[in-house]
Amino acid sequence: MPTIACNIIEVCVFSFENKEPLYLMLRRSLTEPLYPNTWQIVTGSIETGETALQAALRELKEETGYSPKKLWIVPLVNTFFSVRHDTVNHTVIFAAQIDSAVPVQLSDEHYQFGWYTVEQAKEKCVWPGQKKALDIVHEYIVGGKEAASLSEITV
């Protein structure tokens, strides 16, 4: 019987350029054993003893060098099945607004990045769950709907 796990986080990172929202996409290194050369939002594992929020802040810093100006919990949990581990994974998703004046500092896990409109970012995504996360962040959080004020996290 498959196990159920919740040990992965994702962070949709955005900033504003001339009042237009742009989303950060990262391209995994060619040497990464899992999904090399694919584009993704910030993604990482929750370490033992760490909360999902702590993992999101750590992964954001490790993968991009950023600390968020604002942070939200996204009203979506991605779910996927790993055949290799016989596990149903639930992924907690966050959104982070960053200061666009600060340059990206990529970790060795990625070799390329770009800032894209929501449609361009979704075109780069491999996984449907990340496309859906970008849609929700764009509509509800960046769009300033009530869900944004209800899901903002003080950092």
Q: Predicted regions: what is each one?
A:
Residues G129-V155:
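Charged phosphate-binding loop/patch that engages nucleotide di/tri-phosphates or the phosphate backbone
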Residues E20-E62:
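Conserved Nudix-box catalytic region and its N-terminal flanking loop in Nudix hydrolases
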Residues T3-C6, N18, P33-L34, D86-N89, ...:
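A generic fold-level signal
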Residues Q40, V88, W115:
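Short aromatic/basic micro-patch
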Residues I93, Q105-V137:
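NUDIX/MutT-family hydrolases
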Residues N7, G65-V102:
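Active-site segment of metal-dependent pyrophosphate-handling enzymes
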Residues M1-L24:
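Conserved N-terminal beta-strand and adjoining loop/helix that marks the start
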Residues V13-S15, M25-R27, I93-Q97, W115-T117:
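Short, well-ordered beta-strand micro-motif
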